[in-house]
From Swiss-Prot:
Native organism taxonomy: Bacteria, Pseudomonadati, Planctomycetota, Planctomycetia, Pirellulales
Biological process, per Gene Ontology: isopentenyl diphosphate biosynthetic process, methylerythritol 4-phosphate pathway involved in terpenoid biosynthetic process
Binding site for Mn(2+): D185, E187, E291
Protein name: 1-deoxy-D-xylulose 5-phosphate reductoisomerase
Organism: Rhodopirellula baltica (strain DSM 10527 / NCIMB 13988 / SH1)
Residues given in the record as 1-deoxy-D-xylulose 5-phosphate binding sites: K160, S186, E187, S246, H269, S282, N287, K288, E291
InterPro entries found in the cross-reference section: DXP_reductoisomerase, DXP_reductoisomerase_C, DXP_reductoisomerase_N, DXPR_C, DXPR_C_sf, NAD(P)-bd_dom_sf
The encoding gene: dxr
Length: 455
């Protein structure tokens, strides 16, 4: 069957039916994830028999014209447009006024403008917002994502840096406030789906254990002990989580070749269309390093239960290995609309605008070990996942700084992981930091990385 996207005639149209509304705040709407999320929401509004879908608010940093155009293209215009760069307020206000008078835009004067970093927090915590798509790139997305968690929202988490920087703070807040953290990264979404059997076993185990205990014990003991190994307690029967990596544009390059890599070569990802920062992270495999740290916090597993393999075709998005040697993999086209939609509609599955896999052709799928010697960022990611504490915040800040320096032609590509490692070694590690301490270290690590780049 040839690959094709769903068409207007291929699924029922429920837009004329009376359905309860699911409202979404899309933070980082002008990025690749944000644009894909808006496409998914438009499609869901048509094909979801149970809910109508609306964008309650959307944000951008300084890309005013694309943001206003996206807002005007929504079937129901957002009630609020957020521009996090306060210096762009006048330009944004003018663009919004102009759009509200144009017949090509659905925006009206009722759409208000909110400006500045605090506006992101307000958008994420509005009472009528059901789901927050956290798609702001980098450390800048932390406060709004954490605010959504504290507000008990379902968070479709695309901003991996939130967990890298403040994993224990965020996961604790989610547990205390009843928030749902559902991954948008294709790898973590795949792991989440592959763990479905283990979640079912966990529920069955808890029920069975309760049924055989004396009534006096049932009243006082939880179904499972929190002192057990996390992988055993939370995921019965799971041996390890296996994240796949495309290998990026330098998958077959030597270290010497990568030392001379140009910006254009590093930005030429063979599979995914992404923003500049995440594309450079993919080239250095720092993106996979950050995903290892994210998986540690998201699934509450130790670093030695996580593995990375290279899969150039990007069809297998991740795997879970079980104690009996079985492997369950999630396979789908390399299209971010699939994990985005799953995070929005979980546990329901509905028609998605992404194309299907072409089953009329042979599927070429290969897996091979990742090479931490050629990609030292990957080894650094496992090290950070093992030690936890302040390490994630420091490495993330150093990496964001180093990537920016590389994109401006100030350092070599291979300097990126070295600057990250040296910044990590230069800081005084703390195992149980406060959020305030993590934010201070973020500032320190950025400054230190710049100093190291000049040495």
């Amino acid at each position: 069957m040839p690959a094709e996207s769903i068409s207007a005639d291929s699924v029922p149209d429920f837009r004329s039916t009376n359905r309860p509304v699911s409202r979404v705040a899309v933070l980082g709407a002008t990025g690749s994830i944000g644009v894909a999320a808006l496409d998914v929401i438009e499609n869901l509004n048509r094909c979801d028999p149970d809910f109508a879908w609306e964008v309650s608010s959307m944000s951008g940093h300084s890309q005013i014209d694309p943001l206003i155009e996206l807002a005007g293209g929504c079937h129901t215009p957002p009630k609020c447009v957020v521009v996090s760069d306060a210096e762009m307020e006048a330009q944004a206000a003018k663009a919004l006024r102009t759009a509200s008078t144009q017949t090509s835009s659905r925006l009206t004067e009722r759409c208000r403008l909110d400006v500045g970093p605090d506006a992101l927090v307000r958008a994420a915590t509005e009472n009528d917002v059901d789901v927050v798509v956290a798609a702001i790139v980098g450390r800048a997305g932390l406060e709004s994502t954490l605010a959504a968690v504290h507000a008990g929202k379902r968070v479709a988490l695309a901003n991996k840096e939130t967990l890298v920087v403040a994993g224990p703070v965020v996961t604790r807040a989610a547990a205390n406030n009843g928030a749902q953290l559902l991954p948008v990264d294709s790898e973590h979404s795949a792991i989440f789906q592959c763990l479905a059997e283990s979640r079912a076993r966990q529920s069955q185990y808890a029920t069975a254990k309760q049924s055989i205990q004396p009534e006096s014990v049932r009243a006082t003991d939880p179904p499972s002990s929190t002192t057990d190994s996390p992988a055993k307690t939370h995921w019965p029967g799971v041996r390890r989580l296996i994240l796949t990596a495309s290998g990026g544009p330098f998958r077959d390059w030597t270290t010497a070749q990568m030392r001379e890599a140009t910006i254009e070569q590093a930005l030429a990802h063979p599979t995914w269309k992404m923003g500049a920062k995440i594309t450079i992270d993919s080239a250095s495999m720092m993106n996979k390093a950050l995903e290892v740290i994210e998986a540690k916090w998201l699934f509450d597993v130790p670093a030695d239960k996580i593995e990375v393999v290279v899969h150039p075709q990007s069809l297998i998005h991740s795997l879970v290995e079980f104690e009996d040697g079985s492997l369950i993999a999630q396979v789908s086209p390399p299209d971010m609309r699939i994990p985005i939609q799953y995070a929005l509609t979980y546990p329901r599955r509905l028609p998605c605008p992404a194309p299907e896999l072409d089953r009329s052709q042979a599927w070429d799928m290969s897996l091979c070990p990742a090479d931490p010697d050629r990609f030292p960022a990957l080894a650094l990611g496992f090290e950070v996942a093992r030690v936890g504490g302040t390490a994630g915040a420091v490495v993330n800040a150093a990496n964001e700084t180093a990537v920016d320096l590389f994109l401006h032609g100030q350092i070599r590509f291979t300097d990126i992981p070295e600057i990250c490692r040296r910044t990590l070694l230069d800081h005084d590690h703390e195992s149980s930091p406060t959020l305030e301490r993590l934010l201070k270290l973020d500032v320190w690590a950025r400054a230190r990385a710049r100093e190291l780049a000049q040495i």
